[in-house]
């Protein structure tokens, strides 16, 4: 069943909100990166501080890349709405159920088609490529970032206590 006008409007506004949020986060992350850069300029920090700064910068870059890709997906979905092709699976041509679009408004495929693509990626991709995709998923998960950060601090504390 095709999306109703109300459903389409709801999803359109949801995509616009995501677009604004992702654009706003980009500016916030850029200013945070500048602050980190200022902290490291001309100040002789402890080696652990340098390691933390490098890790923070790498995490920021990865998060920026994920946000950039997500913003592209959101923009693509908005363009599909204008073109009249929104909600149609790119792989099968079937309509994407409203429930899926409600959960993932920028979805380009049905759940089944997406699972097939991901299965193909897992079987076709070299192991290092799968590991990279898993790392990106981990880095996009705030709980994982917090956990890795706390583990890093625990290790640094133990190293400093042992001296």
UniProtKB/Swiss-Prot annotation:
The keyword Ribosomal protein does not apply. Residues 19-55, 115-163 are annotated as: Disordered. Induction: By heat shock, salt stress, oxidative stress, glucose limitation and oxygen limitation. A zinc finger (dksA C4-type) spans 89-123. Keywords: Metal-binding, Stress response, Zinc, Zinc-finger. Gene3D superfamilies: DksA, coiled-coil domain. Residues 19-30, 127-146 have a biased composition (Basic and acidic residues). This is General stress protein 16O. It comes from Bacillus subtilis (strain 168). The lineage of its organism: Bacteria, Bacillati, Bacillota, Bacilli, Bacillales. The gene is yocK.
């Amino acid at each position: 069943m095709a999306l109703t006008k109300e459903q389409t409007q709801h999803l359109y506004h949801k995509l616009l909100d995501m677009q604004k949020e992702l654009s706003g986060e980009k500016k916030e992350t850029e200013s945070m990166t500048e602050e980190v850069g200022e902290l490291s300029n001309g100040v002789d920090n402890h080696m652990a501080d340098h390691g933390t700064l490098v890790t923070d910068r790498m995490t920021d870059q990865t998060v920026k890349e994920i946000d950039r890709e997500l913003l592209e997906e959101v923009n693509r979905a908005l363009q599909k709405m204008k073109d009249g092709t929104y909600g149609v699976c790119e792989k099968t041509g079937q309509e994407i159920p409203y429930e899926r679009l409600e959960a993932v408004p920028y979805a380009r495929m049905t759940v089944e088609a997406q699972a097939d693509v991901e299965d193909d990626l897992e079987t076709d991709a070299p192991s290092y490529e799968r590991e990279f995709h898993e790392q990106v998923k981990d880095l996009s998960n705030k709980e994982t970032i917090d956990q890795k950060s706390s583990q890093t601090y625990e290790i640094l504390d133990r190293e400093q206590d042992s001296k």
